[in-house]
Amino acid sequence: MATTKMAQPMRGLMGLVATAIRRGWMPGLDSMIAKPHDERWQTTIPAPFFKKTNPAIVTEDHLVEARDGFRVPVRVYKRPGTPEGAPGYFFIHGGGFIDGGVAHCDHVCRELADRSGFVVVGVSYRLAPQHPFPTGLEDCQDVLTWMAKERPGGLDPERLAVGGESAGGNFTSALALWSRDTNGPRIAHHAPIYPLTDFTGSKIDWSANLSGNPGVTPELWDTVGAMYLPDRDFTKPMASVLFADHADLPPALVVTCGHDILRDEGIALAESYAAAGVETKHQHFADMPHGYLLMTRLTKRTYETMDLMIAEAKKRF
């Protein structure tokens, strides 16, 4: 696939990030891995470059009891005056399964709640390597179950959608599989955003697309994969969701971007969904880098994507 030039100002920023990581001025994924789990849980996106928050949104913090007794931190977001029975949207952050928490995507959750009128829920799932597969995914399963049972923010449990970016996009697809296979909470719509779908790396062209993933190398990819999947079974379908049976999944929006090593496996997921009969919309932003959804100061594509997520979900409610 031909690569369109990355849009500014992201192109300049990605170049600066790559230089900073290379010279040790800024931590890359490899140095993040060395930090304590709870420090990585608190990772935020640097506000001067990426983040514009929406302070008008009402938030509530909760601890959701997971199946093993751990209390999973979640945050509920809604507009003031949101009526009882609004749809619920579970948004799951990325971070390579080893970084981030609610704070990582707080600005995105606020914006989604404001633009949609939905009750939005964010989560701090447990991270690898201390908590490898399937712990983080099970945390998300338990939070979705809690949403359906406890109706935080007064949400309607019959109108639930799920979306997430990068690792969160992987969990989004895996939640749809789990809901189908276990008769779990009904998911009306799901939106994997530039998702990781294939831990084997078989679809990655390491000679291209790296400008949108500064600091990521084949060696680092393998290291992170082994942290999340210590048994190195990289084809298990609840982790490498591309290899799952996709029949009878809920309608989906799959978003991919041109400057991303995950581009081709995201496209492959959209194609597999469609081939399995899943009602699928695939949106490809050829000029965007991986992680652009978080860059709310830098590109209107973030808002375009959020509005698309909302519009596609509303069609199913």
Protein language model regions, located:
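Gly/Ser-rich "nucleophile elbow"/oxyanion-hole loop immediately N-terminal to the catalytic nucleophile
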Residues: 148-162, 182
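Short beta-strand/loop motif that positions the catalytic acidic residue
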Residues: 254-256
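Hydrolase active-site cap/lid region
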Residues: 177-232
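A glycine/proline-hinged amphipathic helix-loop "lid/cap" segment
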Residues: 1-76, 317
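Alpha/beta-hydrolase active-site loop
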Residues: 131-151, 309
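Short beta-strand element of the alpha/beta-hydrolase
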Residues: 85-95
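Short amphipathic alpha-helix adjacent to the substrate-entry channel of hydrolases
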Residues: 103-122
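Catalytic active-site module of serine/aspartate enzymes centered on a nucleophile-bearing elbow/loop
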Residues: 297-317
